[in-house]
């Protein structure tokens, strides 16, 4: 009886150990599965983050976001095409959108004319740096959108001074765009000159020759003679004479010839001896008006000027 009891206890102990081993294995498996689940969850989140924020996108954003320290100098030296490319740029530079800086430089440097897109006079925000004063157009977002569309579709969105500078560039290159010449000849300032001349440019030369003379005379002279105040004044002989005399003083032969169409008597009687002598030397010798004028001088008491010449 004692032997049977001890045998039964030993078997029960073995069963308990076996059950504990199984429980331990099962617990280990459960723990491993739990760790795998946690790791898998975290790993999937990391993968999700990588898909949403790829490295190249982060790098690109960082590259765009940095404003160069010399941004104003770059804007000042930028081409018109480069400035147009910045008209969609919303980043802030010294408290104002970069697109406003680009438009301001376009207006100041390239004489872009945005007045056709505005229903009010254009005003500017003035900002001063140690080197210069910057003018930023004071316009709202809707106006800016219209202006961008206009500048990107209009071939020649320039003011009168802008067209003058294009003509200067083209003349220096020896090739003038016909569309630019056409628009230049229809500027308010140029039409004012043609009104002054009363057809003299057609009688003695051509419209293209007149445009060439004006370009050669320089920007400042042209716009000072054709300022708004002068254009709003009644056309007179005095205005015409002042205009042409200014170009005669610049040694323009065409201006001297044009003076003879309507003002030969004025030249003959009003010019000093030295002025008349210089004037005669400018005249194209084969022109009809030149021959006629020299004949008048030869029949006057100023014949000595011809003999001296």
UniProtKB/Swiss-Prot annotation:
Provide the Gene Ontology terms for cellular component. Answer: membrane
Q: Which family does it belong to?
A: Belongs to the chlamydial CPn_0593/CT_474/TC_0759 family.
The places in or outside the cell where this protein is found are:
Membrane
Q: Which UniProt keyword terms apply here?
A: Membrane, Transmembrane, Transmembrane helix
**Primary residence:** membrane
TM annotation in the entry: 23-43
Q: Which domain of life is it from?
A: Bacteria
Q: What is the lineage of its organism?
A: Bacteria, Pseudomonadati, Chlamydiota, Chlamydiia, Chlamydiales
Q: What's the protein called, per UniProt?
A: Uncharacterized protein CT_474
Question: How is it placed in the membrane, per its record?
Answer: Single-pass membrane protein
Origin organism is Chlamydia trachomatis serovar D (strain ATCC VR-885 / DSM 19411 / UW-3/Cx)
């Amino acid at each position: 009886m004692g032997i049977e009891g001890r045998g039964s206890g030993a078997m029960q102990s073995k069963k308990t150990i076996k059950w504990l081993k199984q429980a331990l294995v099962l617990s280990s498996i459960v723990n491993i599965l739990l760790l795998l689940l946690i790791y898998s969850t975290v790993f999937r989140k990391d993968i999700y983050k990588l898909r949403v924020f790829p490295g190249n996108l982060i790098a690109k954003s960082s590259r765009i976001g940095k404003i160069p320290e010399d941004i104003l100098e770059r804007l000042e030296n930028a081409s018109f095409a480069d400035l147009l490319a910045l008209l969609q740029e919303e980043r802030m530079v010294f408290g104002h959108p970069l697109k406003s800086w680009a438009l301001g430089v376009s207006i100041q440097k390239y004489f872009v004319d945005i007045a056709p897109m505005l229903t009010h006079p254009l005003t500017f925000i003035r900002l001063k740096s140690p080197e210069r004063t910057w003018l930023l157009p004071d316009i709202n977002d809707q106006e800016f959108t219209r202006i961008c569309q206009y500048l990107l579709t209009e071939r020649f969105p320039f003011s009168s001074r802008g067209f003058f500078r294009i003509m200067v560039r083209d003349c220096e290159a020896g090739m003038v765009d016909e569309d630019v010449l056409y628009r230049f000849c229809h500027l308010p300032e140029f039409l004012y000159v043609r009104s002054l001349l009363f057809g003299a440019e057609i009688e003695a030369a051509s419209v293209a020759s007149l445009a060439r003379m004006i370009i050669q005379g320089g920007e400042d002279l042209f716009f000072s003679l054709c300022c708004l105040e002068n254009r709003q004044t009644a056309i007179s002989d005095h205005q015409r004479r002042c205009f042409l005399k200014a170009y005669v003083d610049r040694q323009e032969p065409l201006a001297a010839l044009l003076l003879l169409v309507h003002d030969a008597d004025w030249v003959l009687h009003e010019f000093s001896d030295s002025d008349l002598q210089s004037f005669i030397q400018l005249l194209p010798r084969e022109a009809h008006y030149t021959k006629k004028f020299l004949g008048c001088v030869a029949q006057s008491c100023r014949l000595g000027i011809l003999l001296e010449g």
